[in-house]
UniProtKB/Swiss-Prot annotation:
DNA-binding interval(s): 488-507
Lineage of origin: Bacteria, Pseudomonadati, Pseudomonadota, Gammaproteobacteria, Enterobacterales
Protein name: Anaerobic nitric oxide reductase transcription regulator NorR
Classification via Gene3D superfamilies: 1.10.8.60, 3.30.450.40, Homeodomain-like (1.10.10.60), P-loop containing nucleotide triphosphate hydrolases (3.40.50.300)
Domain named Sigma-54 factor interaction: residues: 187-416
GO biological process terms on file: phosphorelay signal transduction system
Gene behind the chain: norR
Pathway recorded for this protein: Nitrogen metabolism; nitric oxide reduction
Residue positions binding ATP: 215-222, 278-287
Positions bearing 4-aspartylphosphate: D57
Role played: Required for the expression of anaerobic nitric oxide (NO) reductase, acts as a transcriptional activator for at least the norVW operon. Activation also requires sigma-54.
Keywords: ATP-binding, DNA-binding, Nucleotide-binding, Phosphoprotein, Transcription, Transcription regulation
Length: 512
């Protein structure tokens, strides 16, 4: 046996010393470098037909944010389907998911690869991968020795998943494989602000409280709302979305509460309002601060008594709806200014959540970049998509005034630009593919808060402000349409716009 008892005991001790799951996982991975003398390793969690990295060593930081769908990565699929150690020959025709993801060596190909599927009660829960640059790097380790390492990793991961379910008071992981769970987008981030937010989401999801989600544009408030809904007892009922900022005053009441036939000119049939659609489920009211005071009063009544009146109907209708509201405005100040009802504010903000801007969680930029790189790779049908070290450094230094949404758009746009000069299907993103200008010395506004200058991409500066604004809107709409394969409804949803308003804007900009 090549692996000594002392070496295995060292791993066991390291796993016990970790203060958190993340710390334990990283200690395990770090120990593998000494134990197996590997150049790269990763501990992966299996969920919904994909592998999610939990800890890595020797790989680019953005790997932690990537999500490896089995159907896109045949080596990982082979590991998932195997019941034992998998050794890939150096000349294997199956592409390695980590090719191009070795820091500062983007063109380096992995030569030796071993995969260990991890099981708990005969259910696949994850995988351990070890890689090396020498084709014979792991030949002197027997399958039995590697199984021992895999068993220790499986025990650590299984215990962590069990504790996670107990802390969140979730049922067994059968639910995680449901179609509804597959559609839930993940809240990516390991920074302290995001860990705190995730804990708060877990806490409030199990209740039936109304939640006010606050944060700047582009931070992911809708993502938080979805996480709350899918972690609640209402998860099997509808989550209905309404952007209050896109509601014309003339139809806002009908959108919220519905109307009966003949209620007003043009009401040629009955219409079900968003509250009825969300009965027994959740209603997400985005940009709640844009509602008129008149509608705020009617919304308050529904929240207080659970009954509503359709426009043109004298009878009341009982509904059971949980309301999640979001805003990028300071509603406390709006209350003081008389623009928002104090009683509605207190009714909505029973459990307020604040979503941190990206500049306050810069640790997550690399993870998010990897997440969006993998998504862009899949959407554009690329074999490989990676960031150079210089591009990664640029992304981490940029201030991201548009937050996560701006980062997503920047990655996708850079991928489209870089792909234009490639024929192999393997794309490497460098700084030249990003229109990002790092801020120079900040100036200070009269409030004393720093205001960065020279942060506007150079291609926005030519022409007048209207022309630059139109050009920016045109680019964003076109990129979003490409991502959604020309689906205007999906495009409008991502851009948080009313579908009709989007069509009108697209016509004015010459897109339609």
């Amino acid at each position: 046996m090549t692996l000594s008892i002392n070496a295995l005991a060292h791993i066991a001790i390291e796993l016990q010393m970790g203060l958190s799951n993340q710390d334990r996982f990283q200690r395990l991975i770090n120990s593998l470098r000494q134990l197996l003398r590997c150049d790269a390793s990763a501990l992966l969690r299996y969920e919904n037909q994909l592998f999610r990295p939990l800890a890595i060593d020797g790989l680019a930081p953005d790997v932690l944010g990537r999500r490896f769908r089995l159907s896109d990565h045949p080596r990982l699929e082979a590991i998932a389907r195997a019941g034992d150690v998998v050794r890939f020959p150096a000349d294997s025709q199956l592409p390695d998911p980590y090719d191009g993801l070795i820091p500062s060596q983007e063109d380096l190909k992995v030569h030796a690869c071993v995969g260990l599927p991890l099981f708990a009660n005969q259910n696949l829960i994850g995988a351990l991968t070890v890689d090396g640059m020498d084709p014979c790097q792991f030949d002197h380790f027997s399958d039995e020795e590697l199984r021992l390492v895999g068993a220790m990793a499986a025990a650590a991961l299984s215990n962590a998943l069990l504790m996670e379910r107990l802390e969140r008071q979730l049922p067994a992981p059968v639910r995680a494989e449901s179609p509804a769970a597959e559609s839930v987008e993940e809240m990516v981030g390991l920074s302290e602000p995001m860990q705190r937010l995730k804990k708060e989401v877990d806490i409030v999801a199990g209740s039936d409280l109304n939640v006010l989600i606050m944060g700047e544009t582009g931070v992911g408030k809708e993502l938080v709302a979805r996480a709350i809904h899918h972690g609640s007892s209402r998860a099997n009922h509808p989550l209905v979305y309404l952007n209050c900022a896109a509601l014309p005053e003339s139809v806002a009441e009908s959108e919220l509460f519905g109307h009966v036939k003949g209620a007003f000119t043009g009401a040629i049939h009955h219409r079900t309002g968003k509250f009825e659609m969300a009965d027994n489920g959740t209603l997400f009211l985005d940009e709640i601060g844009e509602l008129s005071l008149t509608l705020q009063a009617k919304l308050l009544r529904v929240l207080q008594y659970g009954d509503l009146q359709r426009v043109g109907d004298d009878s009341s209708l009982k509904v059971n709806v949980r309301v999640l509201a979001a805003t990028n405005r300071d509603l406390r100040q709006a209350v003081l200014d008389g623009a928002f009802r104090a009683d509605l504010f207190h009714r909505l903000s029973v459990f307020p959540l604040s979503v941190p801007p990206l500049r306050e969680r810069s640790q997550d930029v690399a993870l998010l970049a990897g997440f969006f790189c993998e998504r862009s790779r899949a959407q554009l049908g690329l074999a490989r998509l990676a960031l150079t070290a210089e591009a990664g450094a640029l992304l981490e230094q940029y201030d991201w005034p548009g937050n996560v949404r701006e980062l997503e758009h920047a990655i996708y746009r850079a991928t489209v630009l870089a792909r234009a000069g490639q024929e192999s299907g393997e794309v490497l993103l460098g700084p030249e593919h990003f229109n990002l200008e790092l801020p120079s010395q900040p100036i200070h506004a009269t409030t004393g808060s720093p205001v960065a200058i020279d942060t506007v991409p150079t291609y926005f500066i030519s022409g007048g402000l209207r022309e630059a604004t139109d050009d920016y809107q045109r680019r964003i709409i076109q990129q979003t349409l490409v991502r959604h394969e020309g689906n205007w409804s999906s495009c409008a949803r991502e851009l948080e716009m009313d579908s009709g308003n989007l069509h009108r804007l697209a016509k004015r900009l010459g897109i339609k």
